[in-house]
């Protein structure tokens, strides 16, 4: 019988749909490392079912998921070969490392296993880059080309719609002259986002990978009776080892010290990664004290505004999100020492 924390599909399906479809939005395509997140999710699920087979699960189900992952990883005509190879390689490294940490760390919580798998995958990726045929510089060029390719696709779609409906577009721009510059503004925005995405690619890839592992873990425990560990806890209970604050401190030190300028890229990525982790922890604190429905509605409205296509609305929403994320980060970082959730939760 499923554990209490493993019942229900509604929230899981919403999270899964967001993980699969939100990266298809133009602005997110321009900055996120993995656009087709199914490449991260399915191999991780296959790893879970393989470990589940070892723990007494059904062999046929494990073979089916491994076959699906193998089919997904198979190179197909029409895919950008260089970036697709990097994407597949990372997915397989991550899934293999996660399976290993699940086998060897039976008593560890999910986040510790996922973080361990991420560390192993990063170490192996760097080692393969140093000793293999694809150095880091070549990988960076491949990633930059992929971002350019995505942005070109987006702009081709926008310009194609405008070209197919010239009369309607002329009517709109005559009534609202500011719309005439919208395609150029969107292209400029996408280019800026891609520059940022290239700079912090490792940290964003790490965050996407952690989300994929969390989803794979949750889906597995909905579908299988062979337990691999405790269920994923709600966001309001999310916390991690307080010693991880040193990762944030190391990143800040590298960025601020002039003598470590050669490692500034590493420092930026450490800051982005741990900033995001502490912001999520802060969101957990907020959800602990506030109504989850109000939080979800606020975030939903903000996302609609952020991707509305109107520059001034987007800027307003972006400013609001940055303030909200900073407040969440401060709460999450403060939770390291204050442990807000040990305080009495308000009943009103």
Regions found by a protein language model. Name each.
Residues 174-233:
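Selected alpha-helical membrane-embedding segments in polytopic membrane proteins
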Residues 1-53:
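N-terminal signal-anchor module of multipass membrane proteins
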Residues 61-70, 113-123, 296-308:
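Central hydrophobic cores of alpha-helical transmembrane segments
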Residues 73-79, 88-129:
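Short helix-perturbing small/polar motifs within transmembrane alpha-helices
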Residues 7-22, 61-71, 246-252:
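Alpha-helical transmembrane segments
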Residues 258-271, 288-332:
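Extracellular/periplasmic helix-loop-helix junctions in multi-pass membrane proteins
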């Amino acid at each position: 019988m499923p554990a209490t924390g493993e019942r229900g599909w509604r929230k899981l399906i919403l999270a899964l749909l967001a993980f699969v479809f939100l990266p298809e939005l133009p602005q997110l395509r321009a900055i996120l490392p993995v656009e087709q997140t199914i490449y991260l999710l399915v191999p991780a699920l296959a790893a879970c079912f393989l470990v589940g087979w070892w723990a007494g699960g059904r062999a046929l189900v494990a073979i089916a998921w491994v076959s699906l992952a193998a089919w997904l990883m198979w190179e197909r005509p029409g895919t950008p070969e260089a970036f697709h190879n990097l994407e597949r390689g990372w997915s397989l490294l991550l899934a293999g490392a996660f399976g290993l940490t699940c086998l060897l760390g039976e008593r560890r919580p999910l986040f510790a296993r996922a973080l361990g798998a991420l560390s192993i995958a990063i170490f192996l990726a760097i080692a393969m880059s140093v000793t293999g045929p694809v150095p880091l510089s070549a990988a960076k060029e491949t990633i930059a080309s992929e971002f350019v390719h995505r942005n070109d696709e987006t702009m081709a779609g926008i310009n194609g719609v405008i070209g197919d409906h010239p009369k309607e577009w002329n009517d709109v721009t005559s009534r609202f002259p500011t719309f005439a510059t919208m395609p150029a503004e969107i292209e400029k925005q996408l280019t800026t986002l891609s520059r940022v995405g290239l700079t912090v690619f490792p940290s964003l890839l790490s965050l996407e990978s952690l989300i994929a592992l969390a989803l794979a873990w949750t889906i597995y425990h909905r579908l299988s009776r062979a337990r691999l560990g405790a269920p994923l806890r709600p966001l309001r209970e999310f916390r991690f080892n307080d010693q991880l604050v040193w990762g944030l401190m190391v990143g800040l030190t590298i960025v601020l010290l002039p003598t470590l300028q050669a490692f500034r890229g590493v420092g930026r990525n450490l800051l982005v990664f741990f900033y995001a982790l502490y912001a999520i922890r802060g969101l957990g604190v907020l959800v602990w004290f506030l109504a989850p429905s109000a939080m979800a509605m606020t975030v939903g409205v903000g996302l609609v505004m952020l991707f509305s296509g109107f520059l001034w609305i987007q800027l307003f929403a972006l400013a609001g999100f940055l303030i909200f994320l900073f407040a969440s980060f401060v709460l999450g970082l403060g939770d390291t020492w204050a442990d807000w959730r040990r305080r009495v939760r308000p009943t009103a």
